[in-house]
């Protein structure tokens, strides 16, 4: 059984039909890259998995560990172990790095107060583990998040999502706007997180960088899967890369 299975979903923004019978699966322990040109439906796919609205998922199912989560609230999906780092990062600029990381504890407590079952959740990941994964954040624990570089803010956004110890971490354009050296640092962190047991689903315009760390790749075009295979297969398939990714 796949950790995440998306089966034949149709998703809409209003009456705009974005995902058209899209199916994909993410296996536990892997790094899966979801690729495609701008407007192909990548972010819509992540939002559909995370329960964010819009889009409106009208047909098909999303299952996580065999449970149907298609119409669940975002908070309940997160409690089950699905984390999402959106493209906008959404760090709190007037709070320090450490205060941003502590917000995950507040989120967990709020869910408990709201009557959601958090009893089966793993404990929040210790800050020491996050600082080990992101040494730059360790050096800047007391620095305001708004004064961090773009790469450091991306690391903080990922670390904050990891604080909840998700089984599946979804990353929306983690390399956007980053210098090549910083991309290398973020890549190293993603691979380290994966080695420690967190499954990764990422979408990325920098196809070469994403393919270089992925185990499995999907390409979507106009809301449909047009390639599904191992990353090594896509590295060797120049025709498919040029046709759908322009690389």
Residues covered by each model-derived region:
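Conserved structural motif at the start of ABC-family nucleotide-binding domains
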Residues: 4-6, 19
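The feature captures the beta-strand-to-loop junction immediately N-terminal to the Walker
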Residues: 35-37
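ABC-type ATPase nucleotide-binding domains, specifically the catalytic core motifs of the NBD
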Residues: 54, 95-125, 142, 247
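Conserved ABC transporter NBD signature motif
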Residues: 58-67, 80, 123-127
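ABC ATPase C-loop
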Residues: 161-162
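Conserved catalytic motifs of ABC-family nucleotide-binding domains
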Residues: 165
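Catalytic Walker B motif of ABC-type/P-loop ATPase nucleotide-binding domains
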Residues: 169-173
